[in-house]
Design a protein with these regions (language model features):
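Extracellular glycan-recognition surfaces and repeat-rich motifs
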Residues: 244-265
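Short, solvent-exposed loop/edge segments of extracellular or virion-exposed proteins
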Residues: 20-29, 134-142
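Short acidic, flexible loop segments centered on an aromatic residue
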Residues: 46-67, 74, 158-180, 184-185, ...
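Terminal connector regions
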Residues: 1-11, 92-129, 205-239
């Protein structure tokens, strides 16, 4: 992304070098800074002063748990008044796999030349996937898992983050005594792009002894390569579930309440 901002030139008598603009390139070529990526920075400097600025050097620095500078210095030589000096891929940094989504950070560019020093902020944003469990699709004529059924389920996962996750593997686990996993516990999913849903498929059998309305809890670990790991919790109800309030309370289903008044039947 080009650097856009206001440069306070002050008194431009003598040498005065500014960051004219900068662009970055990401390791996957989409120009979006994402988790686990190596990013290179190309920079263009301009001498807006009235004198030659000699031996111009730039050092980039940042104190951030999610950003690591890999190549932080470069020399831009001498720059005459109103002239520019550019270097492609002059600097590079690594984004941590754990970076939060929509994470803003600032790299400080310290420019030196002719005994002068100028600091400029390079503002950028990094993105990461944000996965959540959105429900279960049951491949059965009545659309539900009943006691004694063997069905294929599709666990629906939403990515509400700003970065895609490529070819993730979903690992299913459950300690529920009424459920038997017939398929592999690992399913390789399609890429999950921002604001998109994808499914992980597994084959399950519910014991004939499973109580109607029993809620099966499970975990889904989603991993991609060595850089992404997310643990999700989900649930699936066995049999048709309804609320007739004959119990005289709200214990049949996990109701949520709001407001200040007491809820009663």
């Amino acid at each position: 992304q080009p650097y856009i901002g206001t440069v306070e030139v002050g008194n431009a008598d003598g040498p005065y070098v500014v960051v004219n603009d900068f662009t970055f390139n990401t390791s996957d070529g989409d120009d979006v800074i994402e988790y686990g990526e190596t990013v290179t920075i190309s920079m263009d400097l301009k001498n807006v002063g009235s004198e030659l600025t000699s031996d111009v050097n730039v050092t980039l620095s940042i104190d951030d748990a999610y950003i690591l500078m890999l190549d932080d210095t470069d020399s831009f030589g001498d720059i005459a008044p109103e002239e520019t000096s550019s270097i492609d891929n002059a600097f590079s940094f690594l984004v941590a796999a754990e970076v939060p989504d929509n994470y803003s950070f600032t790299i400080v560019a310290t420019v030196t030349g002719s005994g002068q020093t100028w600091d400029y902020n390079l503002n950028m944003t990094a993105y990461a996937p944000v996965l959540s469990f959105e429900g279960v699709s049951v491949d059965d004529p009545d659309g539900q898992l009943d006691p004694g059924d063997t069905v294929e389920i599709g666990v629906i996962i939403l990515n509400s983050g700003g970065a895609s996750i490529a070819g993730p593997m979903a690992i299913f686990s459950s300690s529920d005594a009424y459920i038997t996993l017939n398929s592999s516990d690992t399913y390789t999913m399609l890429d999950i792009h921002p604001d998109m849903e994808e499914m992980a498929y597994f084959n399950l059998t519910a014991s004939p002894d499973t109580p109607i309305g029993h809620i099966v809890s499970f975990n889904l670990q989603v991993i991609s390569g060595f850089i992404y790991n997310s643990n999700l919790s989900g649930s699936l109800t066995v049999g048709l579930t309804w609320e007739d309030f004959e119990s005289g309370s709200f214990v049949t289903l996990p109701w949520n309440f709001s407001g200040n008044a007491d809820w009663e039947i």
